[in-house]
């Protein structure tokens, strides 16, 4: 019995030693996001583009040291009273390189992502496929690279500057009739554009990074008020479209066209 008791005490001592040797990886302050700014904000009254003021959420991806060190994988980041927050707090590991990327609108059914699987992810995130339904939904992307500071040093928040990945289209008409007694009315302005395409986020010129165009959709720009002699006016709505570079030949059924459904002249 005495031998068994001594053995049991020795075993307990070994377990205690093992527990004492377990150490935790040092961590810094919590990773946070703030001041999500959208570049090239527009000023039109009826404008579908997302602005800094109207952006209320985005999905974020984050990697530490290498691409395999995933800390965020499409996590929802939302704004409430100008404060950005997410579930499942992550903390900075001191003196490590970090890579962040974000897409908006958050959780949209019109975009999907195929993430890169190697170091190329550091240049972007992967390939995004986008479907343009009616030209009223924007597509935004941002990335940020930074190195965390030492232990007990504040890192500050990750600040994204979002870029518009789509092009904005509007039409302006001018009454060019040579007589002051003529006015014109333009109604039901439409435009046929590519509906689906993919963009490689590792590229630097996003306007030329679109490929794999498929299908078409018709965007409606509304009407133009009656134009008197030499008067100019814009269509009622602006719309967003997938960029289609002129130097890149597209399939014939996805070429952009403008349709003037009605064009009439009236006397004042």
Region roles according to the model:
Residues 1-4, 19:
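Positively charged n-region of N-terminal signal peptides that target proteins for export
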Residues 4, 96-100, 266-268:
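Exposed beta-strand face motif in extracellular beta-rich ectodomains
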Residues 13-16:
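C-terminal motif of bacterial Sec signal peptides marking the signal peptidase cleavage site
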Residues 199-214:
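Solvent-exposed beta-strand/loop surfaces of large extracellular or lumenal domains
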Residues 19-196, 209-211, 220-250, 259:
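Short, low-hydrophobicity acidic/polar segments
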Residues 6-9:
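Sec-dependent N-terminal signal peptides
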Residues 251, 263-268:
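Cysteine-clustered segments with highest specificity for TGF-beta superfamily mature ligands
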